[in-house]
Regions:
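An amphipathic alpha-helix adjacent to DNA-recognition modules
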Residues: 18-26, 30, 35-36, 44-47, ...
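C-terminal peripheral helix-coil segments that are non-catalytic and often amphipathic
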Residues: 2, 163-196
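Amphipathic alpha-helical packing segments from all-alpha helical-bundle domains
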Residues: 113-140, 144-159, 189
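Helical hydrophobic small-molecule/effector-binding pocket
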Residues: 84-132
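Secondary-structure edge/capping motif, primarily at the C-terminal ends of alpha-helices
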Residues: 78-82, 104-109, 133-137, 164-168, ...
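Residues within the helices of the helix-turn-helix
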Residues: 40
Length: 196
């Protein structure tokens, strides 16, 4: 059984290193332009060597792509979670948006001034909605309190998405921007009702 424990430790260490690499990259991208960041910069910031970096990513573009995809999946999951049960045309917007972002180079997405704010809000909303899933069956009264915050965060995220779409697509997707803004406004009303 010793080899099994060894594999588990190795896996945990690998996960921690991967998180350190991502954190280092996100810190660096706020300090300098993404095109000026090197693998040596990331390795230094994450306190690893270049060989260790290459065990986790083939290149900076590979790292950016995986981080972007991860964010898109989280975004899709948490938005659909907080939309229950009143789902209208919103899934179509999410489908288009996630498809568009999936096909857009990660560097372009991360260079948007709205990206970091979205990351923060989606991460917190994702954790809140997961916690709500686990706890509501034990404490039904917790749902309003937890989902108030989650819906508030998603409302802010939708405003950021609408702004990002306006910034990147210059009027080509005006209808989608309008839908996002309407959904954000609706979520704000939901929050107000839950707070009454």
């Amino acid at each position: 059984m010793g080899w099994c424990r060894g594999l588990k430790v190795q896996y945990i260490n690998g996960q921690e290193t991967e998180e350190n690499i991502k954190t280092a990259f996100l810190e660096l991208i706020q300090e300098k332009d993404i095109d000026d960041i090197t693998i040596s910069d990331i390795a230094r910031k994450a306190c690893i060597d270049r060989t260790t970096f290459y065990r986790h990513s083939l290149s900076i573009d590979d790292l950016v792509t995986s981080m972007t995809q991860e964010m898109i999946y989280e975004m899709q999951s948490v938005i659909m979670q907080t939309r229950k049960p009143a789902i209208t045309a919103f899934p179509n917007v999410v489908w288009w948006l996630t498809t568009e972002l999936s096909e857009t180079p990660g560097r372009e997405i991360m260079q948007s001034k709205y990206w970091y704010k979205m990351c923060e809000m989606i991460e917190e909303a994702y954790l809140l909605s997961c916690s709500a899933d686990k706890r509501i069956w034990k404490h039904p009264d917790m749902e309003p309190r937890m989902m108030v915050r989650a819906r508030y965060l998603i409302g802010g995220t939708l405003y950021s998405l609408a702004a990002m779409l306006s910034e990147r697509f210059q009027g080509d997707e005006e209808d989608l921007v309008i839908v996002l803004m309407e959904e954000a406004t609706r979520l704000e009303r939901d929050v107000q009702k839950l707070c009454e």
